[in-house]
């Protein structure tokens, strides 16, 4: 029994010890900063540490357009090691898994989860090493601050997915503590509940500072890695919907740099995946980046009234929407779209076009040393070939009401963008519209020809009708492993949790309406028992024994009447 005197003694001793610890900590922090002869010396010292960090194996293939000093100057006076983020530990775990699997040509494949239940079942699968959280799933099932669920248009509050990450990560930690306690008592090996989380950051939800805030949130909430796609804020769509608007290559590159810069300031090692939707994208927000010019489409008729002008005129005249829709189809039917080089091929002779291609290759390889030409440069080159021939090409006339350009989404566009993004990211994600192994193989080999260490990501999307693409059972089973051999190390079924949740509950509900508890027992309890699903004893699954153990410590063992997992009321002894 603890007396009041002992309490006072304990409190005096504890208070004194804590005071010494605080003062000691405060002095060490002041020494770390004030011990240097000046702020500049402190910055120089910390910058050297950052440079050494960047030289580690973790960042051997990462480029940065800024210096270590830029990072340190934006950290403040507290040394970076005063803040420790668990997500950075998880990121190192993820990095090592990726390195190992990329080296071996094996997949790091996983399923998207939508709640702690699914996370816990995923964790029990030894050969699934990571977890995934989808923005689509969050948008349609869990928008915490507004509860406005909707399709995946990226228009939910930007803390939506980070908050789901926090929810899943905290659940991982609870189940890890529960499993660790059990293993410490039984001497067994605990389940690894701390699978690194990879999360959907959409398009970053804004400009550079917004992207930095989003990246910071993900690191604080527990995500080991995130992916960012090259779509426009306000024009984002699910990668398997039409109408997505791409941003210029430079804009997305800025997002990747902003993300890395934020994590460098925090001193974390989280991973960023650069996703490109340019394989299927049909719209581009701006023509500002010359690297995109080769893929912008225009018309080859002269003196055509631009579609946007015709549209405004019709709207002013109150023409019905249905008539406007018909006119739009007619306008684009009459004005076929071409890239500049397709336009040249139409207007040049075969020999002229061949001469143009030879001159272009020579200019890019031998003189400019880059893989692209701007529209201005392509026009000048065309004039060199045929000085007297007028080349008609107008990429402004077909622009949409919002001002978007027509874009020729194709595998070549995806390759070009990916080669730009790769040095500033940890992985490259190719978003596709079909599960096509040959397309993936072609993409991989062209990327690896120039950047052999680039790890790739593949979305094994539920949006594909997998049964309609000619797979037999053998090919379907080997698809993941065949992709991994081509460097697609990370593979995920993004909405697996959502679909499995829907179909299992639909089967139960559909039967329950007529069969009552017979349906529940057959479709749930029997299946839980047959498959060794630990949700069957949901009280134990939720951590009731762990909490009882806490109570025993706090109450000095005098808790036999208040424990939740003993006594007649504890019904899980029936199983």
From Swiss-Prot:
What is known about its induction? Repressed by glucose and induced by ethanol and threonine.
Q: Which UniProt keywords apply?
A: Lyase, Mitochondrion
The active site annotation covers: 238
Q: So, what pathway does this thing act in? A: Organic acid metabolism; propanoate degradation
- What is this enzyme's catalytic activity, as reactions? (2S,3R)-3-hydroxybutane-1,2,3-tricarboxylate = pyruvate + succinate
Class of the enzyme per the UniProt entry, highest EC level: lyase
User: Where does the record say this protein resides?
Assistant: Mitochondrion matrix
For this record, the Gene Ontology CC terms, alphabetical, are: mitochondrial matrix; mitochondrion
This protein's major location comes to: mitochondrion
What biological processes does GO assign it?
Answer: propionate catabolic process, 2-methylcitrate cycle
Task: Kindly give the InterPro entries that the UniProt entry links to this protein.
Answer: ICL/PEPM, Isocitrate_lyase, Isocitrate_lyase_ph_CS, Pyrv/PenolPyrv_kinase-like_dom, Pyrv_kinase-like_dom_sf
A GO molecular function annotation here is: isocitrate lyase activity
Its EC number(s): 4.1.3.30
In the record, the note on similarity to other proteins reads: Belongs to the isocitrate lyase/PEP mutase superfamily. Isocitrate lyase family.
Q: What else is known?
A: Present with 1084 molecules/cell in log phase SD medium.
- What job does this protein perform? Catalyzes the formation of pyruvate and succinate from 2-methylisocitrate during the metabolism of endogenous propionyl-CoA. Does not act on isocitrate.
Q: What is this protein called?
A: Mitochondrial 2-methylisocitrate lyase ICL2
| Species in which this protein is naturally found | Saccharomyces cerevisiae (strain ATCC 204508 / S288c) (Baker's yeast)
Q: What is the lineage of its organism?
A: Eukaryota, Fungi, Dikarya, Ascomycota, Saccharomycotina
């Amino acid at each position: 029994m603890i007396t009041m005197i002992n309490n006072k003694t304990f409190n005096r001793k504890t208070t004194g010890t804590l005071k010494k610890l605080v003062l000691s900590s405060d002095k060490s922090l002041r020494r770390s900063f004030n011990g240097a002869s000046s702020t500049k010396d402190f910055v120089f010292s910390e910058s050297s540490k950052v440079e050494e960090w960047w030289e580690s194996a973790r960042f051997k293939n990462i480029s940065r357009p800024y210096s270590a000093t830029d990072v340190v100057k934006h950290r403040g006076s507290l040394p970076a090691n005063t803040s420790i983020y668990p997500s950075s530990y998880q990121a190192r775990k993820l990095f090592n898994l990726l390195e190992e699997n990329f080296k071996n040509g094996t997949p790091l494949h996983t399923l998207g989860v939508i709640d702690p239940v699914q996370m816990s079942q995923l964790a029990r699968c030894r050969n699934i090493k990571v977890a995934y959280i989808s923005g689509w799933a969050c948008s349609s099932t869990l928008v915490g601050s507004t509860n406005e669920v909707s399709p995946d248009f990226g228009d939910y509050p930007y803390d939506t997915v980070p908050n789901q990450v926090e929810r899943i990560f905290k659940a991982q930690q609870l189940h890890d503590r529960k499993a660790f306690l059990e293993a410490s008592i039984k001497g067994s090996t605990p389940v690894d509940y701390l699978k690194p989380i990879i999360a959907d950051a959409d398009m970053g939800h804004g400009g550079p500072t917004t992207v930095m805030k989003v990246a910071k949130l993900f690191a604080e909430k527990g995500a080991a890695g995130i992916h960012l796609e090259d779509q426009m804020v306000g024009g984002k769509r699910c990668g398997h919907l039409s109408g997505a608007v791409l941003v210029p290559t430079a804009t997305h590159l800025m997002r990747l740099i902003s993300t890395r810069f934020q994590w460098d300031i925090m001193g974390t090692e989280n991973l960023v995946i650069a996703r490109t939707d340019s394989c299927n994208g049909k719209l581009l927000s701006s023509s500002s980046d010359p690297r995109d010019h080769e893929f912008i489409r225009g018309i080859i008729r002269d003196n055509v009234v631009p579609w946007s002008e015709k549209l405004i005129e019709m709207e002013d005249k109150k023409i019905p929407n249905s008539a406007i829709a018909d006119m739009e189809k007619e306008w684009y039917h009459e004005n076929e779209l071409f890239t500049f080089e397709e336009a040249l091929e139409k207007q040049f002779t075969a020999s002229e076009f061949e001469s143009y291609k030879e001159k272009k290759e020579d200019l890019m390889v031998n003189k400019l040393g880059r893989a692209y030409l701007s529209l201005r440069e392509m026009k000048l080159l065309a004039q060199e070939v045929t000085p007297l021939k007028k080349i008609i090409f107008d990429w402004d006339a077909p622009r949409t009401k919002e001002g978007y350009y027509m874009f020729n989404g194709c595998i070549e566009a995806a390759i070009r963008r990916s080669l730009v993004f790769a040095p500033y990211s940890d992985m490259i994600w190719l978003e596709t519209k079909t599960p096509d192994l040959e397309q993936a193989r072609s993409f991989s080999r062209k990327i690896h020809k120039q950047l052999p260490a680039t790890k790739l990501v593949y979305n094994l999307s539920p949006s594909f009708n997998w049964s309609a693409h000619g797979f037999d059972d053998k090919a379907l089973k080997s698809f993941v492993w065949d992709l991994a051999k081509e460097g697609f190390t990370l593979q995920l079924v993004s909405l697996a949790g959502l679909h499995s949740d829907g179909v299992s509950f639909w089967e139960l509900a559909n039967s329950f309406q007529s069969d009552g508890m017979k349906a529940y027992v057959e479709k749930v309890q029997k299946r839980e028992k047959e498959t060794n699903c630990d949700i069957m004893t949901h009280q134990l699954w939720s951590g009731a024994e762990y909490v009882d153990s806490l109570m025993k410590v706090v109450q000095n063992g005098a808790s036999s009447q208040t424990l939740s997992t003993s006594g007649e009321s504890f019904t899980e002894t029936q199983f």
